[in-house]
A protein has these predicted regions:
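Short hydrophobic alpha-helices and adjacent helix-cap/hinge residues
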Residues: 2-21, 25-191
């Protein structure tokens, strides 16, 4: 099974960077487009992000465990991500969960949330976020600067993103060099 996943990853490794570029630069992502189109584009980008991130083996409690995406307080994004539950990620089924900052069990691989939710999580559950290798994604100004791994943003009427490489390292995540090359900017926190 591992050999098959490695073979598929190697075979299609050239394809995913181009798909990510296409999603980011898609002309239909202008500000004038409907919110539903923008949410669909963000969903595609979130799915593409996961292809470019490597989680440590201990991020999956069991070999058959689901790849879990949590969404805090954003019903539109939760609904947009639900169709991903029919797909697979890194050999795992995908599960979409309506999450909360009060959750005690952080079994998420990706967590989409606001800056306010992230700040609350960092105050109360920072150790769990890092120990569970959670890739945090948000859109608010200052999201990456406040410890989020990826911030989605509109840049010249196109969807782009910022990476906080220190937050990714703290979470034990390995981001592909393709992500770094496509990022609008890369932040590194001071020690």
């Amino acid at each position: 099974m591992v050999a098959l996943v490695s073979d598929l990853r190697r075979r299609y490794s050239r394809f995913w960077p181009w798909l990510l570029c296409l999603v980011i630069s898609w002309p239909g992502l202008s500000v004038a487009q409907s919110e539903a189109d923008e949410t669909a584009a963000k969903t595609a980008l979130i799915f593409a992000f996961a292809k470019f991130v490597e989680w440590p083996a201990e991020a999956f409690t069991e070999s058959e465990a689901d790849f879990t995406i949590g969404v805090i307080d954003d019903p539109a994004m939760y609904g947009a991500l639900l169709p991903l539950a029919q797909k697979r990620m890194h050999g795992h089924g995908i599960r979409i969960v309506a999450a909360s900052v009060t959750d005690d069990d952080f079994t998420y691989h990706m967590l989409y949330c606001s800056r306010a939710a992230l700040e609350e999580l960092m105050e109360t559950h920072a150790d769990r976020l890092h120990a569970r290798h959670v890739l945090t994604i948000g859109e608010d100004t200052g999201f990456a600067e406040n410890g989020g791994v990826l911030r989605l943003m509109l840049i010249d009427d196109h969807l782009g993103f910022v990476i906080n490489s220190t937050a990714a390292q703290r979470a034990g995540l390995s981001l592909s060099s393709s992500l770094y090359h496509l990022a609008h900017s890369v932040l590194e926190e001071s020690p």
